[in-house]
Amino acid sequence: PLGNPGGTFCGLVRLPVKGRDILIYSNCDTPGGNRENVTVWASFDGAQTWPIKRSVYKPVSAYSSLTAGRPGTASEGTICILFEGGKAFRHEGAFAASFNLSWVLGGERTGDGEVPKWVATK
């Protein structure tokens, strides 16, 4: 996303929603490129804009990876993130979290585009 100082320790996944181009991006979101505050951003237009983001883990952290559940399975609609983190050192351990798009939509607006009405009204 525009202005993200996080570098390349990120994850990216396209959600398997027929007829929609929804991307979820993960990275650290701190000034100066510090490795803290693992955050996910959502794009609804193929990465042209990233109008919403939500913090997953605020302490020190590092590399992250994303995956999305498969249609027609129990995992459908689930987004999973695996990332490095810790209380004092970013490589203390590996952490995992799962959430859905509705959870991301509860985050903060970035000012980079708008959340489409077809998403906001669901």
Which residues does each PLM region occupy?
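Asp-box/BNR beta-propeller blade signature and adjacent active/binding-site loops
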Residues: 1-122
